[in-house]
Amino acid sequence: MKNVTDSFVSLGHWPSAGSFGFNTDILATNLINLSVVLGVLIFFGKGVLSDLLDNRKQRILNTIRNSEELRGGAIEQLEKARSRLRKVESEAEQFRVNGYSEIEREKLNLINSTYKTLEQLENYKNETIQFEQQRAINQVRQRVFQQALRGALGTLNSCLNNELHLRTISANIGMLGTMKEITD
C-alpha cells in the first residue's frame, strides 16, 4: 500500500496546508478530496437526482396509465367492432338465406306460371282444333248435303214428269187444307 501512495505523491504536487481549494488535476488529487467531492455531489445531487428520478418515474407511470387507458379503449372499440362484425355477418347470412329462399320461391312461381300458361295454351290449341274440326265437319256436311240435294233434284227432275208433278202438288195442297181445317 505504501507503494501506491508513494506513486500518487510523486505524480502530483501537494497544496500547502493553509489553503483550501480543488485540485483539478485528477492524478494529483488524493482520496480525501475525491471523497469530499463525491460526498458533496451525493448530498446535493441526491435531491436533484431524486427529483429527476421521481419526475421520470411519474412520467413513466403516467405513460403506463395512459397506455392502459388507451388499451382499455382499444379493447372496448375492438369488442364493439367484433359485435358489429357479428351483427353484419348475421344480417348477411340472413340476407343470403332470404335471398336463396326468395330465389327458390320466385323460381317455383315462375315454374307454376309457366305450367299454367302452357296449360292455357294447350286448352286454346285443343279448342282451336275442335273448332277447326267442327268447321271442317260442317263444311263436309254442307257439301254432302248440297251434293245429295243436287242428286235428289236431278233424280226428281228425271223421274218426275208434269203429270206426277201436278198430282204431288195437288196432294200436298189437299193435306195443307185438311190441316188448316183441323186447326180452326
Curated annotation (Swiss-Prot):
Range of residues in the leader sequence: none
Any one GO MF annotation of this record: proton-transporting ATP synthase activity, rotational mechanism
Residue intervals passing through the bilayer: 27-49
Role of this protein: F(1)F(0) ATP synthase produces ATP from ADP in the presence of a proton or sodium gradient. F-type ATPases consist of two structural domains, F(1) containing the extramembraneous catalytic core and F(0) containing the membrane proton channel, linked together by a central stalk and a peripheral stalk. During catalysis, ATP synthesis in the catalytic domain of F(1) is coupled via a rotary mechanism of the central stalk subunits to proton translocation.
Organism: Nicotiana tabacum (Common tobacco)
Keywords, in A-Z order: ATP synthesis, ATP-binding, CF(0), Chloroplast, Hydrogen ion transport, Ion transport, Membrane, Nucleotide-binding, Plastid, Thylakoid, Transmembrane, Transmembrane helix, Transport
Protein name: ATP synthase subunit b, chloroplastic
Known partners and oligomeric status: F-type ATPases have 2 components, F(1) - the catalytic core - and F(0) - the membrane proton channel. F(1) has five subunits: alpha(3), beta(3), gamma(1), delta(1), epsilon(1). F(0) has four main subunits: a(1), b(1), b'(1) and c(10-14). The alpha and beta chains form an alternating ring which encloses part of the gamma chain. F(1) is attached to F(0) by a central stalk formed by the gamma and epsilon chains, while a peripheral stalk is formed by the delta, b and b' chains.
Encoding gene, per UniProt annotation: atpF
Record InterPro entries: ATP_synth_b/b'su_bac/chlpt
The family this protein is said to belong to: Belongs to the ATPase B chain family.
PANTHER family recorded: ATP SYNTHASE SUBUNIT B, CHLOROPLASTIC
